């Protein structure tokens, strides 16, 4: 059985911070969104978002989210597709920032992703892709 390895995804968090600072997700508290990259998973997904369950919130933890990118898939994408993937995951966060998730449909879809993507100031995102 392969063990999944998780590490911080500072590049993904940089994209999240930049999208929020550009005003596309004003309801997102970037201090409550963590970003991870997983290696060794067999999922077909490119990325996924995890909300803090209501049981944890009832126990006194504040709502939060983890955006997980699947390293083997995410890092093969172009920069444009990486950004679109992060936008898609952020769309799952409801305006209430309650720890819950929005389903695919009216608000979480390719049309909404593209609508946001075409309005981005890409010059501010370049720093997220610097290596070394």
Residue ranges with predicted function:
Residues 82-96:
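Active-site recognition of the HExxH zinc-binding catalytic motif
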């Amino acid at each position: 059985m392969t063990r999944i390895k998780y590490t911080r995804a500072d590049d993904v968090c940089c994209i999240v911070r930049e999208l929020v600072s550009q005003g596309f997700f004003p309801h997102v508290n970037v201090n409550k969104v963590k970003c991870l990259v997983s290696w060794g998973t067999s999922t077909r997904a490119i990325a996924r978002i995890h909300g803090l369950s209501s049981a944890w919130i009832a126990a006194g933890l504040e709502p939060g989210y983890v955006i997980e990118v699947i390293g083997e898939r995410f890092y093969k994408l172009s920069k444009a597709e990486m950004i679109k993937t992060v936008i898609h995951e952020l769309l799952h966060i409801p305006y209430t920032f309650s720890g819950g998730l929005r389903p695919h449909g009216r608000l979480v879809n390719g049309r909404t992703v593209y609508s946001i993507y075409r309005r981005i100031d890409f010059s501010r995102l370049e720093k997220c892709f610097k290596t070394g």
